[in-house]
Amino acid sequence: MALHRSAGADSQSPVILIFDGEVWARHGLIGAVEQAVRAGDLAPVHLVLLDSGGRERRWRELDGTEPIHRYVAEALLPWLRAEHGLDPAPARTCAVGQSLGGLASLLCGLLAPRVVGAVVSQSASLWQEAPARALAELLERDGAQALADSRFVLEVGDQEWVLTGPHDDFARELRRSPARVEYLRYDGGHDYACWRGSLIPALVRLYPAD
């Protein structure tokens, strides 16, 4: 794990949890975030780049069978508070991921909304049923009132044929909840070029500079 603080970030500044953080470090995410902050577009943030640990560990931890939301809520965020003094409101804690990381981000937002109040999910592996199942249970229980203050940004490329249908279905069901939902489809595929191009704008929409 790596932690990067933007200039001007304080204990209440947004915390952005990035799955597959070591990959994003290679793709220049820190520099792109800093450029957006310096330009006055993005509020100062704390980037928490979570290492995937390799292919096998990534599949084991992010495929929806492990309770990743519990790790985030019960271990990671308390550690960031105790060791680094980061104590943002839930609305200022955002889980970000792509593919399996997108699936994990959705589970954090659905199952731990008291601490993770925002999600940016790009090309989530929604052929896995865990997010749809979790959302269905929330809707059946009480109309997913736990998501009343939550925000979700969902993105998928039109060339990701296996994912567009599940994303359409998931977005439709998520809009039955009180959460604020932004669903974007773009002409692209399952790759970092597409994801990077839309990630910074998504963060700016969630956390614009004052």
Annotate each PLM feature.
Residues 1-210:
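Non-catalytic cap/lid and distal C-terminal segments of serine-dependent acyl enzymes
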